[in-house]
């Protein structure tokens, strides 16, 4: 999986190239300027907009090992085990560099300590921060990516230099990207004269996952026709437009919440990208 397999998101791809890919492909240039190879990027935005897919494609671009970390890989009921699990995951990444270490729903592991009542949760966050800082072992060659739908729940210490020092907003795909995603989703399927530009205009605010659902709904309906006819029936623009009418974009609820944080809790301008996207 590489960037060519992901429709749109060109600005985000360029950011990742500068921060992650080029340091791996041009190490001498970056070292000449004293820029370390590795570091952290936090991607946030509505669910279903390609954060996890982008992380996997990043690993594919640099031909690095991809290590995906979920909540269940870390959390343990016994005191001290969660911290040990986290340390072992970082050690695994360090021993197999170049490695992309990807934390999905990172806010679940790095929630704000101000909201915590239990000491164990604070200890895990302290361990996480120490691992990102490379206190006992160097993280050179380890690329740390985090994804979250709720960056406002993440402890602010994670955004300090050397940790997730680049925070990137992953918005719903724009018109051009939606057309590209629909082309990817219908690739290899029986189709007939599909007007992707028309479909892109009709799917404003749809996430990548929403667009996949559009194609899935259209295919399910077309399969019913094919089963009756006994032969495959090609998908048409009309089929996909009809499927669009049956679905609603799932991003609107997220933006309703994000808008409040962007307007009233935007310390340091971290959510300026949301304000710009919403044209506020």
What are these regions (language model features)?
Residues 1-37, 41, 53-54, 145, ...:
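C-terminal engagement/docking regions of AAA+ P-loop ATPases
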